[in-house]
Regions:
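SH3/SH3-like beta-barrel fold
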Residues: 22-26
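Short coil-to-beta transition motif at edge beta-strands of beta-rich domains
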Residues: 1-8
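Short beta-strand-centered aromatic/proline hotspots
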Residues: 10-17
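Short amphipathic alpha-helical "recognition" segments used for binding
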Residues: 17-20, 40-42
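Intrinsically disordered, low-complexity, charged/polar segments
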Residues: 27-48
Length: 48
């Protein structure tokens, strides 16, 4: 699933949602993990 950050408008791919954490992949291929609360607050589903 693709999502967009509300603040910087960049698109990320959701790789995994597990144990209150969300793993995202940036357009450059790098991967990072955030807590699910931050994800819910700052990311929206990308309808493009």
């Amino acid at each position: 699933m693709l999502v967009r950050n509300k603040w910087n408008k960049k698109t990320y791919e959701v790789l995994e949602i597990e144990n209150g954490k969300v793993t995202l992949k940036r357009e450059d291929g790098s991967i990072f993990t955030i807590v699910q609360k931050e994800y819910i607050t700052n990311y929206i589903k990308n309808n493009a």
